[in-house]
Regions:
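Intrinsically disordered regions, especially transient/low-confidence alpha-helical propensity segments
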Residues: 2, 36, 52, 73-81, ...
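...with weaker cross-activation on analogous glycine-rich loops/strands in unrelated enzymes
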Residues: 7-12, 61, 69-131
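N-terminal capping segments
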Residues: 1-69, 152-172
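Glycine-rich catalytic cores of cysteine/serine-nucleophile enzymes that process amide/ester linkages
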Residues: 30-53, 100-141
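Short alpha-helical interface elements
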Residues: 42-47, 84-89, 146
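Intrinsically disordered, low-complexity, charged/polar segments
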Residues: 133-161
């Protein structure tokens, strides 16, 4: 499935900012992607030193900051995003989704839609890059909406998509 339609979305701001980073990738081997490392510097996270360290939370934090919101404390920990914004029962465009992962860790990204069984998640460190992946709905532990400063953007909505593409089972 192609997600090119996301480039035409005018909001919410987190989706617009996330799409600017689409396709950012880890560098294979000993080297690191300086773009990913710069996100940590911009956020003041001095202990983040290499892109082989899980960076889904780093991606969400830089997007949230650039969209004008305050990231959560210890933003690299995916499960900490359960405290961001307001809890929702239905995921809509731009909502932050927090997932479980084997071993007790988590994963975090932005909702761009859903099919019958999966959320379509725009996130970092999904196959070592920023892209959209299908993640099983039953792994989602939190749906969080940005704390809009004026009003919710008019295009924040539920987006139903076709069940197309591989199912992500381990986002590291």
């Amino acid at each position: 499935m192609t997600y090119d339609w996301l480039k035409a979305e005018t909001g919410p701001k987190v989706v617009v900012e996330a799409m600017k980073l689409y396709d950012a990738k880890e560098v294979v081997g000993e080297a690191d992607n300086p773009v990913i490392l710069e996100w940590a510097t911009e956020l003041g996270i001095s202990y983040y030193k290499d892109d082989s360290t899980p960076w889904c939370g780093l991606f969400v934090a830089i997007v949230v900051k650039r969209a004008g919101f305050e990231p959560v404390k210890e933003a690299l920990r995916a499960r900490n995003w359960t405290g961001f914004g307001t809890q929702q029962s239905t995921a809509m465009l731009g909502d932050i989704l927090v997932f479980t992962r084997e071993g007790g860790s988590g994963h975090v990204g932005f909702c761009v839609g859903h099919d019958k069984d999966c959320y379509h998640v725009l996130g970092g460190n999904q196959g070592d890059m920023v892209k959209v992946s299908r993640i099983a709905r039953n792994r989602c532990i939190a749906i969080r909406r940005c704390p809009w400063k004026i009003a919710q953007p008019g295009n924040v909505r539920v987006i139903k998509l076709e069940a197309s593409g591989d199912l992500s089972k381990n986002e590291a």
